[in-house]
Amino acid sequence: MFSPQ
């Protein structure tokens, strides 16, 4: 899963 922070 991609989670930009």
Swiss-Prot record:
One of its GO terms (biological process) is positive regulation of miRNA transcription. The keyword Transcription regulation applies. Keywords: Activator, Transcription, Transcription regulation. Regulatory peptide encoded by the primary transcript (pri-miR160b) of the microRNA miR160b that enhances the accumulation of its corresponding mature miRNA. Acts probably as a transcriptional activator of its corresponding pri-miRNA. This is Peptide encoded by miPEP160b. It comes from Arabidopsis thaliana (Mouse-ear cress). The lineage of its organism: Eukaryota, Viridiplantae, Streptophyta, Embryophyta, Tracheophyta. The gene is miPEP160b.
